[in-house]
Amino acid sequence: MIYSTRASILVALVIWGMAACSTAPRSPEGRDDLVRRAAAALTAWNQEIPGVEGFARQSVGYAMFPEVAKGGIGIGGAYGRGVVYERGQHIGYAGLSQGTLGLQFGGQAYKELIVFDDKAALERFKQGRFDLSAATSAILVKWGYAASVRTVEGFTVFYKPLGGFMREMVVAGQSLSFAPR
């Protein structure tokens, strides 16, 4: 029980520390670059998995994270920035922070697409009341192509490793933030 409490506190502190990073790039050039990279990442993904781009663009809204960096040895974390769209219009920026604790070793980069299936999920996200709850993940090894999709209350998450090597069996919590355009 004490280990569980300490682990929960540690994961929360890692997430809190990464959440302190800014959600939107500070310079106009940085924001423009992020928008370009997000659009290119979604288009490239659609070439590998036809229909992903259409699914996102026809939804209520979506957040595209062109690159999230993740690493850990025992304790780990991830951070990335993304672009948020509502009905196809760029409305803001998103920050993704993740804290992990458990058996893990390595580092990787991945892209993530969060599609909001309904208006309520998008509004929760914009109001800062949107976290991907803690979950236990299985061992993940990325040597080539891999992709996963999961649907949770009001949103669908697409995930694709870009590179690196990561083995993990962890408890993780992912926090998301939003900054209007």
Model-inferred region functions:
Residues 1-10:
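Bacterial N-terminal signal peptides that target proteins for export
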Residues 17-20:
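C-terminal motif of bacterial Sec signal peptides marking the signal peptidase cleavage site
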Residues 22-181:
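Small-residue-enriched, tightly packed secondary-structure blocks
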